[in-house]
Amino acid sequence: IAPFPLKLSRDRVTNENAEITFLEPNHPILNYPNRITAKDFEGWKQEQGLYYPNEWDKAFTPILASNDKGESPKKGALLVAKYGKGNYIYTSLSFFRELPEGVSGAFRLMANLISIQ
């Protein structure tokens, strides 16, 4: 499913209010067209994410991490790799739950994902 090695796990973050860690806060994917902050993860519904990768090629840059209380951080919440003339993005975040619920932060982040150059 990816142009570079990426191993998915069954890991998930079940607490929709789990704190997000910004591993690369200056990365364009978090800053254009919207500046993504912790506020964009407020009001998420049900679980925050699932099928977090636990191994990936060095071509990927981990952007976000998250974890349930008492668990180790899952740094594969959002991975970006340059590929050809564009980018390959893998995300574990539960957009399929957040977008239908109208979570504004999910829409803001999705706009950034499709706008990356």
Residue ranges of model-derived segments:
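Short amphipathic C-terminal alpha-helix that caps PH/PH-like domains
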Residues: 105-117
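Catalytic beta-strand/loop cores that center a nucleophilic Ser/Cys/Thr
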Residues: 2-104, 108
